[in-house]
Amino acid sequence: SWDERFAIADAMLLRRYEAGPSVDPEVARAWERIVASRGRVRVDELAVETGWSRTRLWSRFRSQIGLSPKRAARLVRFDHAAHHLAAGLSAAQVAAEGGYADQSHLHRDVRSFTGATPTAVAGAPWLAVDDVAWPGYRTFLQDGRP
């Protein structure tokens, strides 16, 4: 019957989903390093720490995480900046403490990720909610899967 066929297909898809794609330990460590450094780590440093070339790290990271290491670091740095903006820190303070070259660098990153200004992001604290920004983050670190 169709119900049985759908049940078989559903069970097969569920098994595939639960197995999930595996993540290389080096990629997981690179991600952990990016998060621990709040996005303030150079891709060259990550490559040295993993023992891979910059090109191999870039390729494996992108295929397994879905972002390049540089883009992931920018996103993590932005996330911390958004938290600080939502907490009421000025854009100048956030830029200085967040590793941005200057306030206009922060402005460009905020605009790039949100399409809004730092002032608008400060008024939208939902952008800085961890369980929205990083769903499954803890699971990723424990399971080694995104």
Task: Name these PLM-found stretches.
Residues F61, A73, D109-V110, A122:
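DNA major-groove recognition helix of helix-turn-helix
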Residues H80-H84, H105-H107:
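Histidine (H) residue identity feature
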Residues S1-R54, Q64-S68, H83-A86, S90-A101, ...:
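Alpha-helical bundle regulatory/interaction domains
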Residues T114:
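A glycine-rich, hydrophobic loop/mini-helix early in the fold
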